[in-house]
Regions:
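Short, solvent-exposed loop/hinge segments that bridge or flank secondary-structure elements
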Residues: 26-59
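A broad, structure-centric signal for solvent-exposed, well-ordered loop/edge residues
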Residues: 7-8, 36, 46, 140
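Generic cytosolic/nucleocytoplasmic N-terminal low-complexity/intrinsically disordered segments
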Residues: 17-19, 59-60, 66
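Sec-dependent signal peptide cleavage junction
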Residues: 15-27, 140-142
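Beta-strand-rich cores of mature extracytoplasmic or soluble domains
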Residues: 70-142
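Short beta-strand segments that buttress and anchor functional surface loops
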Residues: 30, 64-72
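Residues that act as N-cap/strand-start positions at coil-to-secondary-structure junctions
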Residues: 23, 31-33, 76, 127
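Bacterial Sec-dependent N-terminal signal peptides
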Residues: 1-21
Length: 142
């Protein structure tokens, strides 16, 4: 009986793991452009009003796929792929991201759209730099 219960719940574990963000990406941040963000395992908020509902984190390939919130003024209910990378010797910026695609019609299209160059973070985001993120004090998410 216990074995049967284990097998019934076993398929749920990989799903839970795919929604887990890397530790460095959790919290409150400001980027190079003074835009603020709050990020957790399931939600990426670009303050004040842009929200991405995270479907999957791919830690190995360093990207996430999200569905744009219905309330977003631009590209509502479309899909976004955000590629990220960590930095060395760029303190206080420890990591950065690229909105690789933000208006894909489907999750599958967003997932397959991959053209970042992490070897060149100054131009590796479709000719633009990765947005560098630095941690800031906590802000209450509403």
């Amino acid at each position: 009986m216990r074995l049967l219960i284990l097998f019934l719940f076993l398929p749920l574990f990989p799903l839970a793991q795919k929604k887990k963000a890397p530790d460095f990406a959790l919290g409150n941040f400001t980027d190079d452009y003074k835009i603020t963000y709050t990020i957790n395992d399931t939600l990426w908020i670009q303050h004040p009003n842009t929200k991405y509902h995270i479907i999957k984190w791919n830690k190995k390939k360093q990207y996430l796929v999200a569905k744009n919130a219905e309330s977003n003024k631009e590209d509502a209910n479309k899909y976004t792929r955000i590629d990220y990378m960590t930095f060395k010797n760029m303190e206080p910026y420890l990591w950065g991201f690229c909105l690789t695609v933000y208006d894909a019609a489907t999750e599958k299209i967003a997932k397959k759209t991959a053209y970042v160059d992490r070897k060149n973070p100054k131009k590796g985001c479709n000719g633009y730099p990765f947005s560098r993120m630095r941690r800031v004090e906590e802000k209450v998410v509403k």
